[in-house]
């Protein structure tokens, strides 16, 4: 009875393995068609969720979803009246501490006070300078500049809304040269190299664009025997958008 049960378990295991292998092979085949074309997708080179670094009310949020922006352009502004007031107070305290130190140093030269008093004045000045630096840092975070040229993918907040540190504000994507990502059979590495040319048929536009392989993935999937390949479309193609998909056609595979 035990031997029969063992055989049943073995058969079930073999069937499960074959089923899993068949599913993997089917998934790999879905990525290509009978003509050897490979499924590919356009991805932004950079996609970032901008978050708040301070607690403040949003004073300026000029961009809406789909709007374009330049690198370095301020795309979020905060009401920082409180932080600016704290900075002015810290700078005034620094000036006062510096004046006390200079006075104590002159008095020490006349032997009116000792070295300890001068050292205390120096410590108070350093503390005031640190407070001013901290306040200056907060004021510097009262606006968010775009790290690259791109477009707004999603707005998480609205103007005049109060946010705290860590709150997501905007999802932005770079709209320069988009990156093509695809999964190809690992045996293609026998001839596929960075710089190899191919064309990509974009389904959403019904157009074909020249492209080239930029880099090959660092490892092969041992189960599916596939590897990731990344490419770029030649030239500036403003009609292309992140998320578009299509087919990569390699001349040697026609």
Model regions and ranges:
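Low-complexity, intrinsically disordered
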Residues: 175, 194-210, 238
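N-terminal beta-strand block that forms a small beta-sandwich/beta-barrel module immediately after a flexible targeting
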Residues: 21-55, 214-215
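Alpha-helical coiled-coil segments
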Residues: 82-137, 155, 180, 224, ...
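Bacterial N-terminal signal peptides
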Residues: 6-19
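Surface-exposed patches in structured soluble domains
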Residues: 41, 59-62, 68-74, 145-188, ...
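Structural microfeature recognizing short secondary-structure transition sites
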Residues: 153-155, 208-254
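Extracytoplasmic
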Residues: 35-37, 43-45, 53, 64, ...
